[in-house]
C-alpha cells in the first residue's frame, strides 16, 4: 500500500497542474521558476536540487522549515540555503493558486499580510499520507486513523489479529529504512513468535541537502519537557575536525542531548556526510551506550566521524580539568 502525496485543500489547487515528489522526475524541461509548497525534507531537497540545476526557486512553508529537526541546526541550514540564493518564505500559509502551467501565481498569507509569488511550475511537497483507500479496511474490521493502521507495538492490528502492518501504513513514520526494520520485526513476531516491538523513539532521519542535516531521538526542547533540569547539551563544531578542515567542508556541528548521568537522549548533526555520522549515534542509542562509552573506542584519524568521540570527550572536560581534578593531581604529586 505505502503512501501517497498529501494534497492540501488550497483554493484553486485541485484544478491547476502541479508536480509531486512522484511526478517531478517526469518534468520535460527545467522550470524557469519553481514554487515549492512545503519546507520539509522533500521540499528543501528538491528546492536545492533545482536551484543548483539553474532554476529560480521559492519555498513557501506555513510554519518553521524542518520543524521536526533540531531548531538550531534547522535555522542554520535555512540561512545557508538563503545565502545560496533560494528564497524561503517561512510562516506563510498558501491560500490560493491562480493561473496554469508556465504562468501561475500562489497567494500566501504571511506575518505582514498576503504576498503573491509568480512562477512557472508548482511542486506540492507538504508530506505524504498512508494509502489506505484501496485496502477496504472496514470489510476486515481493521481499525485505522489518519496515521495509518492502528497496531500493537509488534505491528499486529489491534482489531484484527490476522492483519499486520509494516512501512508507511503502520503509522510510525514514512522512511525506507523504517519499512525495512518493520519487516524484521514482522518476521520475528509473526513467523518466529519472538517478542518484538517496533518502537520509534530512536528513529534516525536525514534530510539529504548540502550540508546534510540528521536527527535521532529527542530534541533539546523535547528532552527538557520530559526530563526537566537533568538535561544537558554538548555541541562540537566541524571546524575543529582536521578531516573537515582538510576537505574544506567545515560547516556545521554535532549536537548531543544527554542527561547528567550520561544517558544519550538525542543527537543532531549538520554537516557534510551527516547521515554517516548519525549511524554511530543510532547504534549507541539502540544499545543504551552512555557518553562514557563513546570515549572508550578508538576513532581512525583523520575522519569526520571523529567528531562523535570529540564531543563525548568535551562533555567530561570540566571533570577532568576542573578545580577538583587539579587539586587531586596536586595531592598525588606530593605523595613520595
Task: State where each predicted segment sits.
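Rossmann-like dinucleotide-binding cores of NAD(P)H-dependent redox enzymes
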Residues: 25-26, 31-35, 41-113, 173-180, ...
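Short glycine-/small-residue-rich Rossmann-like dinucleotide-binding loops
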Residues: 2-3, 110, 123, 127-128
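FAD-site-proximal beta/loop scaffold in flavoenzymes
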Residues: 14-31, 116-194, 295
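FAD-binding beta-loop-beta segment adjacent to the flavin cofactor pocket
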Residues: 4-5, 13, 147-161, 220, ...
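Glycine-rich dinucleotide-binding loop and its adjacent helix/turn
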Residues: 2-56, 60, 84-87, 138-159
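Flexible, glycine-rich terminal cap/loop adjacent to redox cofactors
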Residues: 191, 196, 208-219, 224-336
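Short loop/edge segments at beta-strand edges and connector loops
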Residues: 1, 20-22, 90-92, 98, ...
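A short alpha-helix-loop-beta-strand transition element characteristic
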Residues: 4-6, 143-145, 193-204, 229-234
Amino acid at each position: 500500500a505505502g503512501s501517497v502525496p498529501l494534497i492540501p485543500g488550497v483554493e484553486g489547487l485541485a484544478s491547476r497542474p502541479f508536480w509531486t515528489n512522484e511526478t517531478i522526475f517526469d518534468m520535460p524541461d527545467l522550470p524557469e521558476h519553481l514554487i515549492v509548497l512545503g519546507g520539509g525534507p522533500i521540499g528543501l531537497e528538491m528546492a536545492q536540487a533545482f536551484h543548483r540545476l539553474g532554476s529560480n526557486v521559492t519555498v513557501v512553508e506555513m510554519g518553521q522549515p524542518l520543524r521536526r529537526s533540531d531548531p538550531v541546526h534547522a535555522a542554520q541550514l535555512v540561512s545557508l540555503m538563503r545565502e545560496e540564493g533560494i528564497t524561503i518564505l517561512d510562516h506563510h500559509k498558501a491560500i490560493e493558486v491562480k493561473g496554469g502551467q508556465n504562468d501561475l501565481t500562489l497567494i500566501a498569507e504571511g506575518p505582514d499580510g498576503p504576498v503573491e509569488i509568480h512562477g512557472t511550475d508548482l511542486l506540492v511537497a507538504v508530506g505524504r499520507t498512508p494509502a489506505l483507500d484501496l485496502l477496504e479496511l472496514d470489510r476486515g474490521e481493521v481499525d485505522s486513523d489518519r496515521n495509518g493502521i492502528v497496531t500493537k507495538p509488534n505491528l499486529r492490528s489491534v482489531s484484527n489479529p490476522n492483519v499486520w502492518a509494516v512501512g508507511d501504513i503502520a503509522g510510525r513514520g514514512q522512511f525506507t529504512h523504517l519499512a525495512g526494520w518493520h519487516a524484521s520485526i514482522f518476521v520475528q513476531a509473526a513467523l518466529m513468535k519472538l517478542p518484538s516491538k517496533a518502537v520509534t523513539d530512536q528513529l534516525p532521519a536525514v534530510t539529504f541537502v548540502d550540508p546534510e542535516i540528521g536527527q535521532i531521538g529527542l530534541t533539546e526542547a523535547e528532552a527538557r519537557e520530559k526530563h526537566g533540569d537533568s538535561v544537558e547539551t554538548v555541541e562540537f563544531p566541524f571546524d575543529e575536525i582536521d578531516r573537515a578542515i582538510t576537505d574544506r567542508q567545515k560547516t556545521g556541528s554535532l549536537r548531543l542531548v544527554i542527561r547528567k548521568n550520561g544517558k544519550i537522549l538525542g543527537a543532531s548533526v549538520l554537516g557534510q556526510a551527516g547521515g554517516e555520522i548519525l549511524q554511530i549515534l543510532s547504534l549507541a542509542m539502540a544499545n543504551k551506550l552512555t557518553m562514557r562509552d563513546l570515549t572508550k573506542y578508538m576513532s581512525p584519524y583523520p575522519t569526520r566521524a571523529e567528531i562523535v568521540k570529540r564531543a563525548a570527550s568535551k562533555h567530561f572536560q570540566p571533570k577532568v580539568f576542573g578545580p577538583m581534578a587539579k587539586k587531586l593531581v596536586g595531592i598525588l604529586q606530593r605523595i613520595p
